[in-house]
Structure formats: structure tokens, C-alpha cells
Amino acid sequence: MRDNFNYPPGAVQLLGLCRLDNLHQAVTKEKQILAMPTWRSWISPPSNGKGEFESVNEIKNSEYYKGWQDFLRDKRLLDFLEEQDKFLIFYQHREMRKFPGLFESHSPRIIIADDSSYDVQELLMESAYLVTDYSSIAMDFAYMGKPLCYYQFDYKKFREKHYAEGYFSYEADGFGPVCYTEEELVKSLFACVGKDFYEEEKYKKRRKEFFTLRDTDNCKRNFQAVRELVKNSREG
């Protein structure tokens, strides 16, 4: 950021995100799995802009809908949840919650969450495993030292129409396996959750190298840094 946007010396500092302080209070529920995909700008543009789809029925023909709905009703998943005595909470991005009733549950083991009953940070803190796609909430989950996987069945379209690829490579830098098919997703989920949340050492190593600050002083550091910048600007 400093090099690309020409910030002056001292303006860019490694301080940690304030919201991460609360994550140290996490109490994980071993029976709870969280699936939390991000939105798609071509389906639900911000500020009510026009997308490719104008109704719930049209969205149900999209690759996005089919990818996630097929996963939620996969018989292997439903049987696995029953056998392992687990529950999966599916929580959509707020931009996708503009379409109530879009996704359906075919099992009491799968809960389609609505924002009025659930808090995002609490879900992250409580859940033992995360299935996401491109969402930055994977950072929060990895920060807590918990396993996850990325489900990116529409990778090419997402990069073309939503966000171009940046400095972070999911394959090289991600905190869990990248799955491009439902088969790969089910296999990764079962391999981890079915073996007492086992994960490969390389993902633990990536977490340790990425999160160099792991304490409850993020708010304090940010407050002190802002105060110092304000002080220096007044004196300058």
C-alpha cells in the first residue's frame, strides 16, 4: 500500500485490525459448520444498480445459485451431518439477502440464516469450520486458528465481472484447500471435519507467517497511532 499509493513515511503502519481483538474471546461449538459466500455484482449490484437477473426465478438459473444450492442438498453432505451430529449454517452476504427465500434447506441439519437472528462475528467465533469462496471473513476465521476451505466454482467469471485478481493468491497464500467442484468441496470438508478438524501443516504455517500480530492490543495500537499522526500534523 505504501509503495503503490505513495503514502508518506509513517502513515502506513502494521497495527492490526481493531475487530480482531474480540476474536480472542471465541468459544467454538464443535458441532457447528459455517458456509458464508460473498456476493456477486452481476447478480446483485450495489445501490440497486441493474444486474443480469431481475427476479428470484431468474437467479435460480444462475451458476451462483446452482453451485451453492446443489451443495446444500447434496445427499452425501446431509448424511455426513447426520452421522457426525453436526449442523451447517448458511449465511448469505447482505447484498444477496435482497432476495428472500432464494435458498432452501432440505434438512433440519442445514439452517438458512437471516440477518435478524444472527451476528456475523458471533457466527465466526462459534463455528468450528468455514466454507467460503472469496470473502475476506476467511481472514478472521484463520486468525482464530480454525480450519476452512474455499469453494470457487465460478472463479473465472468472478475475476472477470467482480474483482480482478490481486496480490493474494488463494492457491499459494490461502489458509485452506481451494475447491473448484462440488466433489472437491465435499471431499475437503469430510477430510477435515470427519477427522476431528484435521488440517495440513502448510495451512498452519501460512497462518503463523501471515498474522504476525496476535494479541488484544489492536485497538490500542490504532488509537495511539492516530493520536500521534494528529499530533504531528498539528505541530508540522
What are these regions (language model features)?
Residues 7-9, 103-107, 134-210:
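Catalytic binding pocket for nucleotide-activated donors in carbohydrate/polymer assembly enzymes
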Residues 18-21, 38-42, 93-98, 117, ...:
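Short, solvent-exposed loop/turn segments at secondary-structure junctions
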Residues 18-102, 179, 214, 218:
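Conserved catalytic-core segment of nucleotide-activated headgroup transferases in glycan assembly
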Residues 94-139:
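Donor nucleotide-activated moiety binding/catalytic core segment of transferases
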Residues 13, 34, 89, 111-113, ...:
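Hydrophobic/aromatic beta-strand patches that form the interior of the parallel beta-sheet core
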Residues 1-22:
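Active-site-proximal region of nucleotide-activated glycan assembly enzymes
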Residues 9, 30, 85, 126-127, ...:
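Short, well-ordered alpha-helix to beta-strand connector turns
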Residues 215-236:
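C-terminal alpha-helical cap of glycosyltransferases
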